[in-house]
């Protein structure tokens, strides 16, 4: 089965405005094609992705207001279908963009386990990162974004982040600054594409067999103070129940939010 890569351009510039980040993406796409990987690029800001979330995304209108339809279910389906997810983000204020952060927040709600594998839905998928900016911030953004994607189930290979940084102060962007001729950036893009492609092939052949339910149960039995995740396919928000091990007496129940 052919592997698929989805690259999310999280620039804050809508089409048809020029995106410096798209310049980095344009270097990565043909490299994925050489690897035999089908690649799709989505500019997130061009689509209606609500920042708000609901306990039950499919049926939230039990309250006073009806949920306004947005395009998150459409984008989520593309993320589910992709073997490789690459977040491509400008660096703003030493961070990823708000559009990238919304994607991470939305994915953080995907806590349901696959009934067959007993794993999170993003297991056996690979994550990569492209960053574009000036001055500093690339290592900080890589650390936070890739760590969060790994916590959500993605596998992160070595050298999974590539970036271009301009000179200190205001200066030309990736396109005007001829970032496509910059050795270190070109090297890192090739590292990222090669390693995400390699790991995706490995996981297609030999996926993880970790049973998260069994691991949680074993941990529960050896622990005195247990936070057990209540998993519900139709209610993506994570709920925690805290139990006192002695007698399994329920002492607290809360919902993140």
Curated annotation (Swiss-Prot):
Changing residue 21 to A: Strong decrease of synthase activity. Changing residue 55 to A: Loss of synthase activity due to the absence of substrate binding. Changing residue 53 to A: Loss of synthase activity. Disruption phenotype: Cells lacking this gene are unable to produce 8-demethyl-8-aminoriboflavin (AF). GO terms for biological process: antibiotic biosynthetic process; antibiotic metabolic process. The keyword Hydrolase does not apply. It catalyses: FMN + L-glutamate + 3 A + O2 + H2O = 8-amino-8-demethylriboflavin 5'-phosphate + 2-oxoglutarate + 3 AH2 + CO2 + H(+). GO terms for molecular function: oxidoreductase activity; transaminase activity. Gene3D superfamilies: 3.40.50.360. The record marks 13 as: Important to position the amino-group donor glutamate. Disulfide bonds: none annotated. Pfam families: FMN_red. It is an enzyme of class 2 (transferase). Keywords: Antibiotic biosynthesis, Flavoprotein, FMN, Transferase. It comes from the Bacteria. Its EC number is 2.6.1.114. Belongs to the SsuE family. Involved in the biosynthesis of the riboflavin analog antibiotic roseoflavin (3,8-dimethylamino-riboflavin). This is 8-demethyl-8-aminoriboflavin-5'-phosphate synthase. It comes from Streptomyces davaonensis (strain DSM 101723 / JCM 4913 / KCC S-0913 / 768). The gene is rosB.
């Amino acid at each position: 089965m052919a592997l698929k890569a989805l690259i999310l351009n999280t620039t804050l510039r809508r089409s048809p405005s020029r995106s410096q980040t798209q310049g980095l993406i344009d270097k990565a796409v043909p490299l994925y094609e050489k690897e035999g990987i089908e690649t799709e690029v989505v500019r997130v800001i061009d689509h209606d992705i609500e920042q708000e979330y609901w306990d039950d995304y499919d049926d939230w209108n039990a309250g006073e207001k009806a949920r306004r339809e947005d395009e998150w279910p459409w984008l989520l389906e593309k993320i589910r279908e992709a073997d490789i997810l690459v977040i491509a983000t400008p660096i703003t204020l030493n961070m990823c963009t708000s559009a990238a952060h919304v994607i991470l927040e939305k994915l953080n709600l995907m806590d349901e386990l696959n009934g067959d594998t007993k794993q999170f839905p993003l297991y056996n998928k690979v994550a990569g990162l492209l960053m574009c900016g000036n001055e500093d911030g690339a290592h900080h953004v890589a650390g936070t974004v890739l760590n969060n994607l790994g916590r959500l189930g993605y596998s992160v290979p070595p050298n999974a982040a590539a970036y271009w940084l301009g000179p200190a102060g205001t200066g030309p962007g990736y396109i005007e600054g001829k970032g496509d001729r910059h050795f270190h950036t070109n090297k890192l893009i090739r590292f990222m594409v090669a390693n995400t492609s390699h790991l995706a092939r490995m996981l297609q052949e030999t996926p993880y067999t970790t049973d998260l339910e069994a691991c949680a149960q074993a941990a529960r039995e050896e622990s005195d103070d247990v936070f057990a995740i209540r998993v519900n396919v139709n209610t993506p928000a994570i709920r925690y129940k805290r139990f006192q091990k002695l007698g399994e007496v329920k002492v607290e129940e809360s919902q993140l939010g």
